[in-house]
Amino acid sequence: MSQQYTLPPLPYPYDALQPYISQQIMELHHKKHHQTYVNGLNAALEAQKKAAEANDVPKLVSVQQAIKFNGGGHINHSLFWKNLAPEKSGGGKIDQAPVLKAAIEQRWGSFDKFKDAFNTTLLGIQGSGWGWLVTDGPKGKLDITTTHDQDPVTGAAPVFGVDMWEHAYYLQYLNDKASYAKGIWNVINWAEAENRYIAGDKGGHPFMKL
């Protein structure tokens, strides 16, 4: 069997994002949901390897969706955990990202207008997906975009993302997505977002390198 991906540890305790994201949600989201994507990605890559060795082209084609879905889930969640931080560790403090803050204000007129635009995008997602702040390069043009299901961001560099799958909020907020979207601003890791914006890396996810 080839080398496998593993579940990355959280950079903070499971209860550290309360009251905005409960300990129960964080434990289930990380230990169960993210682990499932990691397991699915490893299984799909092993199936791809065997299909290639057998020159089984139909199997090679059929396994691509599983690689995309589970690989995207692993990428998105690995980014998500790091773009959150407890309030006591600086979560929610936009002043920790002076370069990014200035770019946001230039693009949207004010930080509050940006938050309103981002939340409108989040609440407009139909079904399951993600909302993202992205840049087209190092300290580049900012934009708000969405991805469906577990599709990762492509063609741009993710600055930060918000998981809008029900498993990210339902046990705490039920169907009140607006309160989840409002609360998560209190735990955004702006220092991490600043680093991603300055780097503008469109594909360099170190956790995806075996």
From Swiss-Prot:
Species per Swiss-Prot/TrEMBL record: Aspergillus fumigatus (strain ATCC MYA-4609 / CBS 101355 / FGSC A1100 / Af293) (Neosartorya fumigata)
Name of the protein in its database record: Superoxide dismutase [Mn], mitochondrial
Single GO term (MF): manganese ion binding
Principal subcellular localisation of the protein: mitochondrion
Cell location: Mitochondrion matrix
Keyword Metal-binding set for record: yes
UniProt record similarity statement: Belongs to the iron/manganese superoxide dismutase family.
EC number: 1.15.1.1
UniProt cross-references to SUPFAM superfamilies, sorted A to Z: Fe,Mn superoxide dismutase (SOD), C-terminal domain (SSF54719), Fe,Mn superoxide dismutase (SOD), N-terminal domain (SSF46609)
Family annotation (Pfam families): Sod_Fe_C, Sod_Fe_N
Record text on subunit structure and interactions: Homotetramer.
